Regions:
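Aromatic- and charge-enriched surface segment that lines or borders ligand/interaction sites
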Residues: 5-54, 79, 84, 173-176, ...
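Sec-exported extracytoplasmic/periplasmic mature domains
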Residues: 23, 40-48, 90-92, 99, ...
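Gly/Pro-rich hinge or "lid" segments in bacterial periplasmic/extracellular proteins
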Residues: 61, 67, 72, 80, ...
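A structural "hinge/loop" feature
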Residues: 1-5, 28, 94-104, 214-216, ...
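Solvent-exposed, polar/charged alpha-helical surfaces in well-ordered, non-transmembrane soluble domains
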Residues: 5, 12, 33-41, 96, ...
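Periplasmic solute-binding protein
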Residues: 8-25, 98, 206-220, 259
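Ligand-site clamp/hinge motif
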Residues: 119-125, 148-195, 230
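Local pocket/hinge segments that shape ligand/substrate recognition
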Residues: 155, 186-263
């Protein structure tokens, strides 16, 4: 949606009209074919893309991913400056999902020129967003600068972004934030309580994740009986469990596998 100036959605299709001023960081136009190439690559079973299943609402996507149909059968095509997506089934959440990075376009000629180096380093990537990666020390740091060809560049008020510390350790991130080495830190379950007790300002946001309790269905187990599972489920207080047992700020109980934003 960020590259489109408008879109129309019906139960059977989605049509995106691309911005005429959408550009890659090399100055060339972002075209509908860039999305077709990218999406076909993602659904290719040989690629084994981890988010390929997010495309399954698209016509033939699941069968293509299983190898039952050729990649060209995927229900996506370019017509001029429009990207047309045919749906296998009505999809109320598809517009939100298509903002995920897995659906980003790829310029085919650039991809082919990089061969197997595509995406391996900053110089082997092409960008159509507000910033370009200029330095990437894997697992340590990265730097970005403003993309001079971005269609809304006048609204971007930062010239550079420097991420001086990259770590998967939640405790390290919190300590770096406390030492004013970083401006924002994403917290984990083991650090969010400490941050709250310290009086730090916390912001919560939907993570796209869900936790649940599962039953052991092995033969001979009491929980293999559906009536036992129903009895436990009917007496389980999710509000009590989340708010008093887990007791992590930002966690919410839910009664459905579907997130609240699904229409």
């Amino acid at each position: 949606p960020g590259v489109a100036e408008s879109w129309q959605i019906t139960p059977s299709s989605m049509t995106f009209t691309l911005r005429a001023d959408a550009r890659w960081s090399d100055g060339t136009a972002v075209v509908a074919e860039d999305f077709v190439f990218s999406w076909r690559r993602m659904i290719d079973p040989k690629v084994a893309a981890p988010y390929a299943s997010t495309m399954f609402p698209i016509l033939n996507a699941e069968r293509v991913h299983k190898g039952e149909l050729p990649i060209q059968a995927l229900g996506v095509r370019a017509e001029g400056n429009q990207l047309i997506v045919d749906l296998q089934t009505p999809c109320g959440y598809c517009l939100a999902v298509m903002a995920h990075s897995a659906f980003f376009p790829i310029k085919q000629s650039f991809y082919a020129a990089q061969a197997d180096k595509y995406g391996a380093e900053a110089e082997y990537l092409l960008y159509n967003g507000p910033f370009m990666l200029t330095d990437w020390t894997h697992g340590s740091r990265l730097s970005m600068k403003k993309n001079p060809f971005y269609w809304q560049r006048e609204e971007i008020h930062l010239n550079e972004i420097n991420v001086g510390y990259i770590t998967a350790d939640n405790r390290t991130r919190l300590n770096l934030f406390r030492d004013q080495q970083i401006a924002v830190a994403r917290l984990g379950a083991e650090t969010v309580k400490d941050a709250a007790k310290s009086g730090l300002r916390l912001r919560t946001f939907p993570s796209g994740g869900m936790a649940y309790l599962g039953f052991n269905h092995r033969q001979g187990r009491q929980t293999a009986k559906v009536d036992v599972r129903r009895a436990i489920a009917s007496t389980f207080d999710s509000e009590e469990f989340v708010n008093k047992i887990i007791a992590i700020p930002g966690y919410r109980s839910t009664q459905s596998f579907f997130p609240s934003w699904v229409q």
